[in-house]
């Protein structure tokens, strides 16, 4: 994360002009009311397509705290540069776990500072995606860059284990946190190292210009045109399997640590011994790239407010600093290129790295929590796992009435299975002041089995789970209609399901939902 402005007024005006030109050249799909996982995801369509597609993750806390790592916000310079290079770029937004089907249509999956741990099922999906020829770009940060105060930072999320919490990934969490849907299916493992031959170290270095650049001929041409790369509080990586992974950018010798580092910050005096700042990996048919700081990727155009406080975010124009832009676009170009070799030993003329020497206390089971976590107490009423507690203007905040989309549901983040709760049904685009009939609503699981009862208009309840009795909706002068229904879910059901609105027997709108044993929350 950058700590200071990087551009003067003149350069900033030039950057703004460049951004405006980029938007007009590319054709960003505008989104109304695109504020949560159930809204249409933004995308960038290139004027001249190269036939390849890049997907940016926005399902694991990428907008928590000051982060705004989305393609129409704090990562827009990067995303637009990829669009200018011919890539179709899209954001992944959803409220359920990532699956292989989410990734398989894309050449590269970019993960900017995930702050919510990936479930083992998601790790399996990502690994299967890479082994099948896809590529992932992991963008990390310094240790303890815990933006949503859930005790997990991006380095820990990517590695697969929390520092000092190897035996219990929910250590120190409240009962509600540990029981949240976000923490279900999470298990400690040395996942990144075991599968990609590299791991993020839990160091925390300060403001440093990386100028130890591996020559393009030994870096798959990713470093072509790259002499320097910025770091503004970041980490390095450790190569654990040189047959899979290789460093391509290193820091100079340094003792400069991040001012708030919980330990010595700099582990081996910088240089090659500190481990690479930027690295790559070849896994089966696919690839991966890694960088230890989000500062080189971000720009100064955040989209959202802070989910915890509602405050304005400040991000910086790091993509324009040093040779950051060239490195990042080159990285995606390499990641998007399919190559048949499955090990770095098969690359003619390539000099393999030596494994990075790490301390015994860096081994997963030996790590310790050096300071109490989270690093600060969350604001009163803010729960990182519950978007209904997020502040207005943040990603996931959903109390505004949707007056744009044809259909929408408003409900709490997880649907309770032990009590009656309410759902608001919204329709737009109807004929002004008209009444339409024949609507019904139901909730069904992955097997198509109905799992909910909907209260009848006379206050009684049906005897079996299924679609509701028919009801009508009357539009106002603007063609907007709403109806609130009370629902009771089978108490033995939990996990993923679908909520569907029909008109007679025709499906009109379907939304993926999650069912859990959670308290009832009032509608916003």
What feature does the model see in each segment?
Residues 33-105, 142, 315-319, 337-406, ...:
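Aromatic-Pro/Gly-enriched surface loop or interdomain linker
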Residues 190-299, 373, 421, 426-428, ...:
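Catalytic beta-strand/loop cores that center a nucleophilic Ser/Cys/Thr
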Residues 2, 10-34:
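Sec-dependent N-terminal signal peptides of Gram-positive bacterial secreted proteins and lipoproteins
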């Amino acid at each position: 994360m950058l700590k200071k402005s990087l551009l003067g007024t003149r350069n900033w005006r030039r950057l703004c002009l460049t951004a405006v030109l980029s938007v007009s050249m590319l054709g960003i799909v505008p989104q109304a009311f695109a504020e949560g996982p159930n809204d249409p995801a933004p995308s960038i369509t290139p004027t001249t397509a190269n036939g390849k597609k890049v997907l940016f993750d926005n399902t694991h806390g990428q907008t928590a705290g000051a982060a705004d790592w989305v393609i129409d916000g704090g990562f827009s310079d990067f995303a637009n540069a990829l669009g200018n290079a011919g890539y179709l770029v899209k954001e992944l937004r959803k409220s359920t776990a990532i699956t292989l089907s989410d990734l398989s249509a894309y050449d590269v999956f970019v993960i900017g500072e995930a702050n919510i741990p990936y479930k083992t099922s998601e790790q399996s999906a990502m690994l299967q995606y890479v082994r099948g020829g896809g590529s992932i770009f992991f963008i990390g940060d310094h240790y303890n860059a815990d933006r949503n105060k859930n005790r997990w930072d991006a380095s820990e999320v990517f590695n697969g284990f929390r520092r000092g919490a190897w035996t219990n990934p929910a250590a120190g969490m409240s009962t509600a946190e540990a029981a949240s849907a976000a923490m279900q299916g999470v298990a400690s493992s040395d996942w990144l190292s075991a599968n990609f031959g590299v791991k993020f170290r839990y160091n925390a270095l300060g403001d440093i210009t990386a100028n130890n650049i591996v020559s393009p001929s030994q870096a798959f041409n990713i470093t072509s045109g790259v002499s320097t790369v910025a770091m503004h509080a970041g980490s390095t990586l450790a190569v654990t399997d040189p047959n899979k992974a290789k460093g391509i950018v290193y820091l100079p010798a340094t003792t400069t640590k991040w001012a708030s580092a919980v330990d010595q910050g700099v582990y081996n005096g910088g240089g090659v011994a500190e481990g690479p700042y930027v690295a790559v990996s070849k896994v089966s048919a696919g690839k991966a790239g890694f960088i230890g700081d989000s500062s080189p990727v971000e720009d100064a155009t955040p989209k959202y407010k802070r989910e915890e406080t509602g405050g304005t975010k400040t991000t910086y124009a790091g993509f324009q600093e040093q040779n950051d832009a060239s490195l990042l676009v080159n990285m995606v170009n390499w990641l998007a290129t399919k190559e048949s070799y499955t090990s770095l030993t098969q690359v003619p003329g390539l000099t393999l790295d030596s494994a990075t020497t790490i301390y015994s206390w860096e081994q997963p089971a030996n790590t310790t929590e050096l300071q109490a976590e989270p690093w600060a107490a969350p604001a009163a009423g803010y729960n990182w796992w519950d978007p209904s507690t997020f502040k207005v203007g943040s990603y996931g905040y959903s109390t505004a009435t949707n007056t744009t989309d044809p259909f929408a549901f408003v409900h709490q983040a997880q649907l309770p299975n032990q009590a009656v709760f309410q759902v608001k049904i919204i329709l737009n685009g109807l004929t002004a002041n008209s009444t339409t009939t024949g609507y019904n609503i139901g909730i069904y699981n992955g097997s198509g089995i109905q799992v909910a009862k909907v209260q009848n208009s006379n206050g009684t309840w049906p005897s079996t789970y299924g679609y509701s009795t028919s009801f009508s909706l009357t539009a106002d002068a603007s063609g907007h209609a709403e109806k609130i229904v009370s629902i009771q879910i089978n108490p033995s059901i939990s996990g993923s399901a679908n909520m569907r609105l029909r008109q007679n027997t025709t499906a009109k709108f379907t939304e993926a939902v999650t069912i859990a044993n959670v308290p009832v929350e009032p509608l916003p």
